[in-house]
């Protein structure tokens, strides 16, 4: 049975990757269908009730700069906002928000339902229709066939998902949801390498049974940050505190005594878990010398008593979970509302993807999110936006696009995955980016919004606000560069008390702002130097661009040198056996990875500068040298 309409792009799955993919495709004018097994769970925060953090906040800002929904929903649902690394340089500062699950889900669903060109339909997908190595549609559980020349799979943890609590296990996509067994079997028939990963979640605690007076209160920032570049602090709901407590030796003894009933330590779970978000069992085992681990007590919303104890993800049996929770200070009488669990699921080797997130072997088939081996809402959302955008570009007959490593954390993420692959759930950190001084949260819109507008992702409202901000920044920078102060000026007497060394020669206002003891608000508050610009985010940008101009230029020079051959394209059908001078090891790795560019090839383990030179000579001789889009 065929559905009565044909679509341009079909997105399968309604999590963070799927919603951003569907919205991106629809914003670009493609007739888009979002298929989900349950409309009520669109935008569900399946694990922790938080968005952002180190590296992750940068991705959220980039999604926002390209017109995505995640930051807007976070501003609407955020019940505590904090700027992490606020005492450090701007490159590593990151925004993190606790989010009310219900409010976040509601906002995402509202955005989806009001998006032109987007249809939502509730049905699980069981089959892909592939003809001549090209996807042409999908078939749902009830046998209904939908046709489209592009399909984006964002299946999360649902592919052959298996939930573990102690030595008991059962099939599930997440707690309360069925797995995608038929679709997993269908995907295993494709020429794409498959593996198993696992992730986990902690037990949820009833706040009424917690003694918060025994814990350390953790308040949000004041003044409050916003997540979206078009966000307003007045959009935030009521703000609440989190709390901090710790495990202790008794907790650790309880966990050790239960390890023989742990699915991870008894060999029941084969999937590899996330290195940077380990279970409490893993922490006790890997950090045996530590007698305490920090736990963040995070509220799940304003109208629920559920608490998320961040730091004790576990798949131990329920009785062990209850005992370990009650051994923790402030939770001696705690009641568990939902048990913690681990979930194993299929993922596909991201080295089998192009940097557009289209599979190399099936035309029109795109993957995004945990199916590619990543972990985290932010990583999923960023991939979803890219995949949905490229699916739309492709069916419009246009070149696909992916930012380079020096342009966005999204570029770093995709390059890492498609070049190196991953054996464990991949999460983003600022340390993964070579050019992080340029890839700051504060300038994500300056880096990406113009490109987003060109691609059709950015609407008129966002573009107008961005253009106003850019004009304010440029006008103010020109003013600071063109106005001078002389040592004999009356302004010197007002200025010198703010300086470590008095003014001794002519200087521009820009020169003054470069001084470490002066910041922009202080300089603007001195009579004769202001009033400056009112927009706080534009003012911050002025200060950063002035104070870090030397470092930024130095990093830009490094990029210009490195980029000469970074985007030189490599034919996907090139047989490296035919390239004279390459070692057998390099030939094997190049034929396995099939990198799309010389830049990707250079990052494959075992590649040498000499091998790259040989490759470039071969390409030039054969007339194959080309620049990637």
UniProtKB/Swiss-Prot annotation:
InterPro entries documented for this protein: FAD/NAD-bd_sf, GIDA_C_N, MnmG, MnmG-rel, MnmG-rel_CS, MnmG_C, MnmG_C_subdom, MnmG_C_subdom_sf
Keyword list, A-Z: Cytoplasm, FAD, Flavoprotein, NAD, tRNA processing
Biological process terms in GO annotation: tRNA methylation; tRNA wobble uridine modification
Gene Ontology CC: cytosol
Annotated FAD binding sites: 13-18
The keyword NAD is assigned to this record: yes
One GO molecular-function entry: flavin adenine dinucleotide binding
Localization, UniProt: Cytoplasm
Cofactor or coenzyme needed: FAD
tRNA processing among keywords: yes
Alphabetical list of SUPFAM superfamilies matching this protein: FAD/NAD(P)-binding domain
One Pfam family here: GIDA_C_1st
Residues bound to NAD(+): 273-287
Family to which this protein belongs: Belongs to the MnmG family.
Role played: NAD-binding protein involved in the addition of a carboxymethylaminomethyl (cmnm) group at the wobble position (U34) of certain tRNAs, forming tRNA-cmnm(5)s(2)U34.
Entry-linked NCBIfam families: mnmG_gidA (TIGR00136)
Subunit structure: Homodimer. Heterotetramer of two MnmE and two MnmG subunits.
Protein name per the record: tRNA uridine 5-carboxymethylaminomethyl modification enzyme MnmG
């Amino acid at each position: 049975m065929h559905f009565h309409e044909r679509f341009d792009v079909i997105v399968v799955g309604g999590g963070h990757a799927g919603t951003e993919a569907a919205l991106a495709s629809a914003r670009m004018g493609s007739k888009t269908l979002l298929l989900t097994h349950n409309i009520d769970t669109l935008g569900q925060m399946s694990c922790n009730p938080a968005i952002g953090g180190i590296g992750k906040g940068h991705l959220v800002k980039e999604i926002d700069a390209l017109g995505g929904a995640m930051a807007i929903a976070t501003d609407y649902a955020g019940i505590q906002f904090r700027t992490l690394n606020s005492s450090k340089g701007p490159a590593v500062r990151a925004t993190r928000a606790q989010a009310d699950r219900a409010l976040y889900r509601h906002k995402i669903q509202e955005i989806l339902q009001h998006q032109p060109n987007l249809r939502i339909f509730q049905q699980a997908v069981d089959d892909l229709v592939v003809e001549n190595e090209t996807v042409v549609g999908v078939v749902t559980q009830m046998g209904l066939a939908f046709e489209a020349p592009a399909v984006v799979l964002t299946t999360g943890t649902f592919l052959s998902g298996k939930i573990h609590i102690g030595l008991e296990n059962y099939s599930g996509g997440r707690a309360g949801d069925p797995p995608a067994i038929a679709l997993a079997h269908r995907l295993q028939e494709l020429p794409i390498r498959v593996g198993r990963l696992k992730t986990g979640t902690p037990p949820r605690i009833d706040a009424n049974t917690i003694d918060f007076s025994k814990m350390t209160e953790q308040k949000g920032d004041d003044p409050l940050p916003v997540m979206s570049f078009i966000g307003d602090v007045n959009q935030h709901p009521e703000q609440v505190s989190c709390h901090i407590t710790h495990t202790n030796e008794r907790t650790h003894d309880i966990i050790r005594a239960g390890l023989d009933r742990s699915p991870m330590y008894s060999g029941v779970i084969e999937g590899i878990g996330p290195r940077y978000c380990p279970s409490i069992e893993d922490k006790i085992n890997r950090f045996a010398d530590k007698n305490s681990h920090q736990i963040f007590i995070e509220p799940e919303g304003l109208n629920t008593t559920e608490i998320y104890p961040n730091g004790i993800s576990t798949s131990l049996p329920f009785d062990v979970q209850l005992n370990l929770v009650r051994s923790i200070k402030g939770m001696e009488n705690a009641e568990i509302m939902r048990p913690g669990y681990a979930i194993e699921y299929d993922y596909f080797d991201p080295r089998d993807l192009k940097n557009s997130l289209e599979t190399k072997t099936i035309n029109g088939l795109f993957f995004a999110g945990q199916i590619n081996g990543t972990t985290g809402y932010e990583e999923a959302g960023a991939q979803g936006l890219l995949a949905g955008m490229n699916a739309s570009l492709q069916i419009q007959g246009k070149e696909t696009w992916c930012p380079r490593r020096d342009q966005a954390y999204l570029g770093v993420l995709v390059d890492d995955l498609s070049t190196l692959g991953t054996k464990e759930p991949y999460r983003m950190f600022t340390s993964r980016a070579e050019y992080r001084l340029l890839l700051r949260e504060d300038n994500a819109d300056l880096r990406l919004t113009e490109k987003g507008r060109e691609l059709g992702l950015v609407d008129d409202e966002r573009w107008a606000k961005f253009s106003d901000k850019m004009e304010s920044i440029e006008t103010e920078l020109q003013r600071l560069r063109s106005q001078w102060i002389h040592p004999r000026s009356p302004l010197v007497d007002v200025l010198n008390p703010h300086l470590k060394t008095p003014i001794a020669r002519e200087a521009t206002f820009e020169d003054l702002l470069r001084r470490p003891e002066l910041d922009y608000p202080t300089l603007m508050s001195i009579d004769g130097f202001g009033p400056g610009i009112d927009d706080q985010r534009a003012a911050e940008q002025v200060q950063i661009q002035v104070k870090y101009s030397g470092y930024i230029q130095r990093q830009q020079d490094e990029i210009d040198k490195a980029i000469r051959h970074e985007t030189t394209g490599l034919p996907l059908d090139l047989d490296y056996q035919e390239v004279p001078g390459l070692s057998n090891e390099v030939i094997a790795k190049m034929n396995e990875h099939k990198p799309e560019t010389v830049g990707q090839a250079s990052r494959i383990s075992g590649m040498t500068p000499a091998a790259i030179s040989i490759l470039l000579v071969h390409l030039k001789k054969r007339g194959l040298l080309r620049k990637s889009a």
